[in-house]
Amino acid sequence: MQQYMRKVAGRRVRGRLTRAITRPPFHDELGRKGWLAEISRAQRHVIRRLHLEIAGWPQWRRPLRVAFLSDLHTGSHSDDVVRLNAIVHDVAALAPDLVLYGGDYVNMQPFGGGRVPPRTIAAILSRLEAPLGRFAILGNHDYVYGARAVIDALEHHGIPVLDHARRSMRFQNHAIDLVGVPDAGMTRAEAYALLAGLSAERPTIVLAHDPVWFAHLPTGPHFMLAGHTHGGQIRLPGIGIIRTATKAPRRWTHGLVEERGQYLYVTSGIGTSGLPLRWGVPPEIVVLDTAGKQRT
């Protein structure tokens, strides 16, 4: 039944895409040359830099710099290993204090690419060093591939996996917690309990694969980083996002969200799944400079 439903969903998405690209305003606005140019442009990664002032966070001498990569889907394109090396080089040049990986390292739908072993991916990611370390969670593709193999590969290369786990660290003599909420491997009740147990006073970064968990973030000095949606992966002019792949509200598909006095950032990720292309949603490296909110 699940396989049948996936096929039905895939036909619906393909149908919507076909109808969209054969009618105005899409066809009239871009034309054939513009269509190809936009596809080419949308495959090149961008560096997304943000400065966040978070209520309840320390007034550090300088902001805590966090680099965030998610949804690599290595193998969704034939040149992904070369691209991943270039991305790691670009992130290293930004000198992050902390590096976080949001899951879906492997790709289970390798149209035009191929399967890349987790150890190859982890070896490349391990070249990216940071004073506070590198930490990861798993995504749905990693669980389909085999969670144990992906975890072993990451941890073999010095990248701890925080699936349903917490890690404490210190930055400029202030404590910070890091909590991981994976895409699977835990019950919904366990995830609720993990989030409910966050300190109401201690600054916490919650690393989640799916932004749906932002709805359950308790009151406190916390912010969440998530992926999974690919920012929609395809955002057509005059039509918008074709598919979000999450039960989270559509407004949580991509970018910075501020609700209830708390922040969520949902990255568009790096790779693709399903169709091996992006449109209007380029892959991105996310770099956040975080600090305490200035008192007025």
What is the role of each PLM region?
Residues 1-65, 70-79:
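Acidic, histidine-bearing metal-coordination/catalytic regions of metal-dependent phosphoesterases
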Residues 37-41, 69-84, 106-116, 142-146, ...:
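Acidic/histidine-rich helix-loop elements
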Residues 45, 54-66, 159-160, 167-179, ...:
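Beta-strand-turn-beta hairpins that frame and shape the catalytic cleft
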Residues 63-76, 175-184, 205-209, 263-269:
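Active-site-proximal beta-strand elements of phosphoester/diester hydrolases
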Residues 67-70, 98-104, 133-140, 162-165, ...:
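Active-site neighborhood of phospho(di)ester-bond hydrolases with catalytic His/Asp-centered motifs
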Residues 79-170:
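Core catalytic region of metal-dependent phosphoesterases/phosphodiesterases
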Residues 152-159, 163-165, 171-208, 212-216, ...:
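Binuclear metal-dependent hydrolase catalytic cores centered on His/Asp/Glu-rich metal-binding motifs
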Residues 156, 211-292:
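Conserved beta-sheet core of the metallophosphoesterase superfamily
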